Amino acid sequence: MTLSNQLSDLRLFRQYAYIDGKWTHGDAGREEAVFDPATGEAIGHIPVLEVEQIRGAVDAAEAAFVQWRALRADERCERLLAWYDLLQANREDLATIMTLEQGKPLPDARGEVEYGASFVRWFAEEGKRTFGDTIPSHIPNAALGTIKEPVGIAALITPWNFPLAMITRKAAAAMAAGCPVIVKPAHETPYSALALAELAERAGIPAGVFNVVLGEAAEVSKLLCDDERIKALSFTGSTRVGRLLLEQSANTVKRVSLELGGNAPFIVGPDMDPREAAFAAVAAKFQTAGQDCLAANRILVHESIHDAFVEQFAERMAALTVGNGLESEVDLGPLIHGQAVEKASAIVDDALSRGATLVAGDQREAPGPNFFMPTLLTGVTPEMQVWREENFAPVAGITSYRDDDEVIEMANDTEYGLAAYVYTHDIRRIWKLLRALEYGMVSVNSVKMTGPPVPFGGVKQSGLGREGGVTGIDEYLETKYYCLGALGSVSGS
């Protein structure tokens, strides 16, 4: 199934890079195919750009920076709000593109379009609130203060699991601040990024302000990191790659924002109803087929309700439908490619070899080679991969704990620190866990925790900086201090 025969607006299906307001082939004619993970069929091709073309994107952004930063904040706001309106108006086509290239169920894709668009609206308005400060002067006859200025060109390297929202969350903040952007989307999911470029052009965003480059990830990323004209780099992806990009950006001393891996604990207190908690845990685990940095990775249940919780979890998990994301009533789509399936299988095999119990998860029922059936393991322990690694698959590992002190130690036993979930109605337990958990975000009695007002980000090896909220735009702003001296006395006659 091709994208073009599924869309009401065929112009949203672009198979070229977008640089300086122009749709661009690769100079050497190199291409790579993009596949539907549900069927394995190619849905299109994209160019592999040459080095000089990537540098040309930086040239375009550099030229556009002069004009874009000179606009008033309310003028940039108007263009971003026009972009927001177009995202909403084209939600169905954008969702279809996303499902075909990424695999997630169509309702989830629609939700991502809404979620991604909401950041455009949020930052369009936040750009008008980049206030400076007035500083009480310690210098006679002087006025002191600060102003906020755009940092410069921002390079945005985005993942395949949320191919639209991870772009808008970064790009809207940067553009609202006055910074042009160069987007490098994941090669598995380029078409969402290119559709965003088409709509940005329609919204009146000037040429060179929003660019999309395509090519071999390591080569393009290295070029962007090495170019001193790029002043900010924002990356969402694995901790391993994030460390590499941080190292590569050191020579040019870039402003670096990293949203990296997660290994979220889901803690269930002894006072919880097992059914309520289990249903919430299933939702936290299996969104996007587990391919989510916020997915519950280690489910830690008090020993007094462990068995009842496992029973309810297995029952709810069994009701999930796995299939092509374009089909109705599908809860889980495919994994992104065969390597992801192989990794999921290896994680399960490792756990079983180390003593875990397979409660459910018959892979013979998978509807295709890129699918992985929801899997439940109990008795998981710290030496297992399912405990130590971000599995990015529909594999749930459950274990029990005795008391709050033990579960805090278990939850913090990881290099990651992005998000944690706590389910309990005991206010003292809530406060104790909230303070003791080493995570950038803690959600209590709610699976949903993110959105435009939220400062999204982690601690430890889960990243640097925050996206969203009132501080998200600061990733793309410099604070300039001024001292106005020799102003004379302001005392009256």
Curated annotation (Swiss-Prot):
Keywords: Cytoplasm, NAD, NADP, Oxidoreductase
Pfam families recorded: Aldedh (PF00171)
Keyword Magnesium among record annotations: no
Gene Ontology terms: biological process: ectoine catabolic process; gamma-aminobutyric acid catabolic process
Binding site for NADP(+): 160-161, 184-187, 237-238, 260, 390
Entry-linked SUPFAM superfamilies: ALDH-like
Catalytic-site annotation from UniProt: 259, 293
Gene3D superfamilies: Aldehyde Dehydrogenase, Chain A, domain 1 (3.40.605.10), Aldehyde Dehydrogenase, Chain A, domain 2 (3.40.309.10)
Catalytic activity line of the entry: L-aspartate 4-semialdehyde + NAD(+) + H2O = L-aspartate + NADH + 2 H(+)
Chief location category: cytoplasm
Coiled-coil zones: none
A GO cellular component entry from the record: cytoplasm
Compartment list: Cytoplasm
EC id: 1.2.1.-
Deleted gene: phenotype: Cells lacking this gene are unable to grow on ectoine as sole carbon source.
Family, similarity comment: Belongs to the aldehyde dehydrogenase family.
Protein name: Aspartate-semialdehyde dehydrogenase (Non-phosphorylating)
Source species: Halomonas elongata (strain ATCC 33173 / DSM 2581 / NBRC 15536 / NCIMB 2198 / 1H9)
Gene name linked to the record: doeC
